[in-house]
Amino acid sequence: MSEDLVGVIELTMDDVVEVQMTSENEFIYLDFVDPHQVYDKVVVVDAGHGGNVPGATKMGVYEKDLDLQIVLELKKLFDRCDKNIGVYYTRTDDSNPSFASRVGLANDSDADVFLSIHNNSTASGRMSAISGTEVMYEAGDSTGESKKFASLCLDKLLKALGSKDKGTVVGDEVYIIRMSKVPVALVEVGFMTNVEELKNLQDKDYQQKTAKALYDAVIEYIY
């Protein structure tokens, strides 16, 4: 009696590649190609924190979960996008990739843009009236593209959310910003230490508005 057997081969590559598969005469051929040979544009999206690193934590709410929820809403938009864009995500579950692997994904894929999504907290971690949206960029980027992208993200978010403008902020002390070789923006959507914003950030409609604003910013920037 014959049985259908399934085999799995896992390959670990040094670079980010797309796989093109062809078959002929019962042989399967795999070609590993640069993402830019397949897609018109390449985007890397990062959900902050994850796993045993929750980020800001307030009233039983973890930043890592809010960051991921927004990213998953953003993924829905990119999945429906009719443009030829390759989008890579540093995480789509409750994992915690290293800082090096996060920025490495952007650099190794030579992404057209790298977007990292976070939420903010006061320095003390105490609840306060401080609120608003800010976006970090790489001041060391001599092309000015990082700041340009950050400004676009901020503008779209302010219009969509009606949040307070906390401006664009130099973020070179942040590893994934400092080490990025591609245009990068790290978005702090809102303050979890503000009662109203914490409530908003947990709201599905608010998360969808956030995702749509960032989607629009990415599309406008890369095209």
Please place each PLM-identified region on the residue numbering:
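Signal-peptide-cleaved, periplasmic/extracellular N-terminal interaction regions immediately downstream
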Residues: 1-43
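A generic structural micro-feature
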Residues: 3, 127, 179-181
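Generic detector of short, well-ordered, non-transmembrane alpha-helical segments enriched
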Residues: 5-7, 63, 183, 210
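Residue-level marker of positions within ordered structural domains that often coincide
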Residues: 14-16, 72, 140, 158, ...
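Short beta-strand
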Residues: 20-22, 166-169
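Catalytic-core regions of hydrolytic enzymes
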Residues: 29-163, 174, 199, 208, ...
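Active-site-adjacent mobile loop/cap segments within catalytic or ligand-binding domains
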Residues: 123, 136, 167-223
